[in-house]
Amino acid sequence: MKTYKNRIYDAILRDALEAKGAVLIEGAKWCGKTTTAEQIAQSVIYVNDPKQLKQNLVTAQTNPQRLLAGANPRLIDEWQIVPEIWDAIRFDVDHSDGDGKYILTGSAVPIDDEAKRKIRHSGTGRFAWIRMRPMSLFESLESSGSVSFADLFAGKGTLGDAKQHTLEEMAYLTCRGGWPRATDKSGKAALRQAFDYVDAIVNTDISRVDSVLRDPDLSIRIMKSLARLQGTQASVSAIKADLAPNAPNAVHENTVYSYVGALKKMFVVEDMPAWCPNLRCKTPVRTTDTRYFTDPSIATAALGLGPDGLMDDLKTFGFLFETLVARDLRTYAAANDGKVSHYRDKSGLECDAVMHLRDGRYGLIEVKIGGEALIADGLKKLNRLASEIDTKTMKEPAFRMIVVAEGEYAYEESDGTLICPIGCLKP
């Protein structure tokens, strides 16, 4: 029997169950939602179990309360297949005592018109939402955790050794991704998981998510385009233009929008929103989201790249390393009840990531694969942005950090900026 690797989301789920009657865990397929929920659940129904699926569909329409019978917390896996159950849960939570009754997991949102008609209430006040992602390096035991974001925000952060990874090893981790199944394997078997994942998306899932038939060939071409545009604020028209050289027929922007929208509904794409701070100057802030997959291995698999391919193309590696860091930062932020955004203004000043908490504390983060010149560029950007922030109306940044791929330990520059290998971070 496989040993369960503790997830950062274990504590997030427990806290949510203490606060609400039901918790919805959303996230990409294979990221570990069901397994994590099973650690806490006292009973479970697998809606898509082939032996029970037909019966579950009928029961959801005729007597949805029957599907709720069982010890609490009760896990309802792939709940979006029977959206009628949503209102049944809301009603039960309203008319019973106690929190932490239900856990719902799903790899897609029920977004077609028929499913929407089956959900009459939003769930506000009864449900808590958790967005789960593939494993961070700390969860897959590939980060020492010597630098804690919680400590940095508390003003007591200490710097320590990193779990050392060579650039070649980081290329492997980027291609392998944080899929729990992949972290239990090694070599080719581990790398294959992302390729199988992308195959499933383009051949079945992207059409199944909203019952719209989509072309597998165009699906993979759009995913390749998104992979080439990771870490950019590319518009739908820019994606269309990227497709043009390899497209036998013109692709309409509405078609691109539909395909990208389907990928978002499956949590395959998770764009990063813009951060809009109060600035001393009046430079307009860009509000376009930054394009990211939920895991860097989706990009490498879509492009047909392995670790050697990344090492032969360090520019692409740099962009996809940024996707890996974005994945980890989002999980570390979630553990601190925070979020991650990006900053870019009309003058070209940008910051790859801003981790911000609900109480107004925030940290500025640049991502660089490594090298003195790139680190110097990151220092310049961070210091310039910090100097532009109006500290009369906002707090000063709790920290400034550059995340790099390699390094034996984290250290502090003379200006106070932290240089941290990705292999030393934790929540």
Question: What are the residue ranges of the model-derived segments?
Answer:
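N-terminal pre-Walker A segment at the start of P-loop NTPase domains
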Residues: 1-14
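Hydrophobic anchor at the beta1->P-loop junction of P-loop NTPases
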Residues: 25
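Conserved lysine of the Walker
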Residues: 33-34
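Short glycine-rich substrate-engagement loop in P-loop NTPases that contacts/grips substrate
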Residues: 45-73
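Conserved catalytic/switch belt of AAA+ P-loop NTPases
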Residues: 86-110
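Interdomain motor-coupling "hinge/lid" segment immediately C-terminal to the ATP-binding subdomain
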Residues: 112-232
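Accessory nucleic acid-recognition modules appended to NTPase machines
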Residues: 187-361
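Domain-level recognition of nuclease-like catalytic cores that cleave nucleotide substrates
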Residues: 405-427
